[in-house]
């Protein structure tokens, strides 16, 4: 992606969040060519404070490493493009709401429909947490449900 002088590179690294951070901090990884690195993970029922601390330790004078945590899962961000999030008890609740909003079957629940309303990013940023809560700060793990995805999109100039 290249947007008004901002370029983005997406790299998929398989494994749990701490494995991802370890790989990015390893000898074969050079983050110095980037001003910012954003690592997007799901909460998945596990505390991610250790992951966020390791992201901060990866930062240098040249590169800031941010951790984005979606609680309980990334479907919180997707759901917010369609409607306000609900008070999900867990990942299964958020995923059921996603299927309800998109009409996807259980078999296709990890797919993105062709008609995702990506143009509703501003609305999604306001709806990705409960009305009684505020958007969690950058590099934090918010309450359930919430996500810090809006901070990444603001950094990219998309919000």
What are these regions (language model features)?
Residues 2-11, 18, 25-36, 43-159:
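C-terminal accessory helical subdomains adjacent to catalytic cores in phosphodiester-
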């Amino acid at each position: 992606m290249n947007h008004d002088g901002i370029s983005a590179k997406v790299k998929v690294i398989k494994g749990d969040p701490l494995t991802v951070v370890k790989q990015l901090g390893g000898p074969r990884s050079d983050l110095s060519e980037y001003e910012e690195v954003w690592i997007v993970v799901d909460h998945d029922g596990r505390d991610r404070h250790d992951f966020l601390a390791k992201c901060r330790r990866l930062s240098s004078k040249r590169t800031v490493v941010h951790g984005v945590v979606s609680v309980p899962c990334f479907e919180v961000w997707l759901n917010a493009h369609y409607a306000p999030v609900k008070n999900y008890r867990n990942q299964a609740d958020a995923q059921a709401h996603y299927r309800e909003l998109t009409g996807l079957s259980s078999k296709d629940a990890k797919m993105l429909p062709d008609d995702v309303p990506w143009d509703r990013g501003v609305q999604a940023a306001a709806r990705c947490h409960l009305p009684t809560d505020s958007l969690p700060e950058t590099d934090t793990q918010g309450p359930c449900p919430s996500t810090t995805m809006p901070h990444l999109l603001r950094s990219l100039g998309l919000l």
